[in-house]
Amino acid sequence: MVKFSTSITCVLFFSVFGFNVLAGKSYSNNAFAFKFQQDTSKKVKSVDTIGEMVRALMKYNKLKDTIHLNSVKNVPNLSLQQMVKGNLAGVYVQETTGEPGTEQSLIVRGPSGLMFNKRDFATLQPVIYLNGVPLTQDHTFAYDVQQYDYTRIGPGNNLLSQVNIDDIQSISVVKDPVELAKLGPNAANGAIYITTKQAKGGIRSISLNSYFGYVTPPGVYTTNASYEDDFRKTFYNRYANAENRANYPGFLSDKTNSDYFGPSNWNDLYYQTAPAYNANLGISGGTERANFRFFGGLTKDAGNADDTGFNKYNLGVSVNMAPFTWLTVSSIVSTARLDRDRNRSFRDRFAEARYIPDLRVPISPNASNYSAYLSEVDKSADLNRTTALNGNLTIAAKLSRLKLSSAFIFDYSESVRDHFTPSTLMAGSNFVSTYFGYNQRILVNNAASYDFDLNTDNHKLTVQIGQQFQTDTYKYNYTRGYNGPNDFIKIIRVLGNVYNNDGTLNPDYLNAYPDFYVFRFLDKLESNLFSVYANASYKYKNIFDFDAVVRRDGTSNGQPDSRWVTTPAFNATWHLGSQILNSNKTIQALDLSAGWGRTVNIFSDDRFAAGPQFRAEGGWPSEPTVPGYASIVTANRPYTSGYVGYGLPLPYADRTNVTIAAEMLNGRLSLALSAYNRNNKQQVINTPVAQELGYISSYRTGLEINNKGLELLANAALIKAKSGLTWTTGLNLAYNRNEVTALPDGLSELVYQGNKIQVGKSVGSYWLHANAGIYETDSQIPVNPSTGQRATFNGIPFQVGDPKWVDVNNDYRIDESDKIVTGDRLPKLTGGWNNTFSYKGFDLNFNVFFALGQKAINQFDANRYDFVNRESANDISSVREISSWQAYSNAKTYPIYNPFSSVVPYRQDQDLFLEDASYLKLRSVTAGYSFTKLFTKAGIKRAYLYATAMNLFTVTGFSGVDPELVNFNGIYDGANITIPRTFVLGFKLDL
């Protein structure tokens, strides 16, 4: 992180509330000075807004942890996660699939909580402020009615895809404890500011940007049944008995079957070269007292497989007015529509329909058979649409030294999915599902500040008080139905007659037609947050800054005795350069900043506020949505999901941050080193309880997780030749160490959802058996001297061909007590390296990013080798996609165990399949040329042509297709679409 000074913090905060602020820089000490405007008609040429304030600070981006937009604005990134990947220190992005428009993960300075499933990761995400609007995300309560969490019900669109890089003025990550404390509970996991280009006065300005290109398919080595038959022969020749051979899969037995042993040419129907393009227009203009900006854009992106695609439509308007010299009014509204063509995979379709067919025979790799399947898929329907609307209205008044502001802020997103699967793909019974849901957030912010007159220019003091009210609403209606009338009616038909023929009310009105089995689910969650705060900012000359804030938050999601929490924070900055470097010609500035702050993390679920409760839980793990018995809805205690009692205070996070930043060589080199420590305390976790209580588990407080680390930012102008040749480079590095420091009731370890959480280990650790080889002879199998019996695995004696798993406690019984906690799902070191070369009108940019130290379980290989149990299980993990008919050049080889053994030798919970998933990628290369000088007389301010290539190569030791395709939980299943290599040609034109 680079320095977050008190002055920057104040300006960003005041800007959010609409204050008009001027920024200036003292080059002698590298400090900032700000003052409020007094007369909008005389002091400035245009009305300032949030974006104008941040734009004023962009000149000093060496002192902020901000993306250098010049290096990413020519790269066709679709989502915010893709824009910040490798460009912000301490921000780790997981893009687990190349399918455009899907969910992606952002984690700032390490995980604050558990990370074993999609629900966990959703609670780790930072808040995103778009023009001061804290954006909502899809709520996790929808997972309560899902059997699988591959994709959340609904369209599954990435809501952070609504931004357009050509409309963005700045992207900054907030790490200053004081700034985060001011933002309150929304920023418990960190915050990222996005500011779009705002309205400004002056001559009308028009900006036109566009690109066109293609995503390309990967190189594929296809296989047929002969390849799989040869693979299995090794195991059958060594271990199979007569019964095993008699049960050999039929699709591998008949070598004359051309469907499986014939041409494997499915790839041309699955992989694709698809167009990607973008076009947008921005117009701004107006007078000094009233001005506007309009932005509209269309983006089409595509995946390189399975006919996936994504369309985005953007529209934004901002208006500024100054009706009086002491009053300003600013408003900005942005809207976007997101349409996604999702994949046609078996797994996702089966998970949605909760229907698992006979999986013993996979789909044929032959193009004719696969084409016939796709023709049936074309009879399906799948609409995935999200509409987002957000904005704010800010009124600010300046009355001498008193400043008043009031802001109305809103965010609303609406999601729809209509899905239909014909009966030909569902064993004679078609399937329909519909989803409607929305997320709504409304805020009212009021603030007043006063600049005290201390009768001296050496001391400056500003005090601010404020009040905020926030209300959130999340709702969804989800319906799925089976056995519709026919495949032409692709909606859930209901009986529409209010009255019977005899005039009586029809009790079945709006019920589904007979034999149409319909299941309906709905949920709604509302929460309110009320906050008051006080902030004081003090400045002594250009030597010392001090900022402090105290905030009081009350939430409806808290328990009665802990709904209100007080959180303080402070930060101090010493401008050492003004004291010790006045005559130094090498170092022009040296600043030391230190801060501490506390942020409350309110519960996202209202179940904890209710205390002991009843729930509709009549199901079981494989069918969690059964609401009752014999058509009667039942309410029961949460015996399976976990008892909720009292004594659950709100979690909170304590942050400490120390940063030293320097500017050297007349601005050609800037360095910043930050050390941070964050303790997340009083977190609630579901823990086991005694069986005689009737409950499986109970929610308890006491989980504590610590993240500490170092971050380095370096920016340098390595070459600034008189000939016009320049080379600028930027490097960001972030090291993070995660550790569980406490568990409820003083526990040292806890088995949780098939994982073990252990104090002193990372929360992202794996719980695995340690593999030490293979038992090749009977003499190698250990014998218990006290019983004379062979060592066992969960009570099953070891045989020749079984794995050697380490007996940690030396009791000759391999079980869960012998598993070890090892590895980490998240990297230790992340970073990015950006370089730009320019010569006259030409420029060349390339971007490299990397993540080192993370581990992944190769479930894809585990399932491939465990073919006996996978095929006999016939569950969701047994699904074989069409893309499984290919071989990989970097595939690993494993010991030849007995796949028929009852110990399941190729189980995935062993370190045999734990791999180093570190990687380094050349993410983008851009070459461009400015034609501006050729069109100056034509009134063109800028004309720029560029070409960009993305995802060019990866350096990794991981045996899978791509280490980025590892799922959020650290499992690589090989089911995700590859991230495509993309080539585009574009232009930027300013008039």
What are these regions (language model features)?
Residues 81, 697-706, 747-766, 817-834, ...:
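C-terminal extracellular loops and terminal segments
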Residues 824-857:
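Glycine-rich, aromatic-lined ligand/substrate-binding cores of catalytic
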Residues 113, 140-142, 147-148, 155-199, ...:
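Outer-membrane beta-barrel proteins
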Residues 209-257, 475-492, 700, 721-823:
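Conserved small-residue
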Residues 851-945, 949:
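Extracytoplasmic gating/loop element in the C-terminal half of outer-membrane beta-barrel translocons
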Residues 128, 538, 808, 837:
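Short aromatic-centered micro-motifs
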Residues 318-337, 367-421, 431-768, 905, ...:
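Extracellular/periplasmic, surface-exposed regions of secreted and cell-surface proteins
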Residues 1-302, 306-316, 328-330, 388, ...:
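Short, small/polar-rich motifs associated with maturation and membrane association
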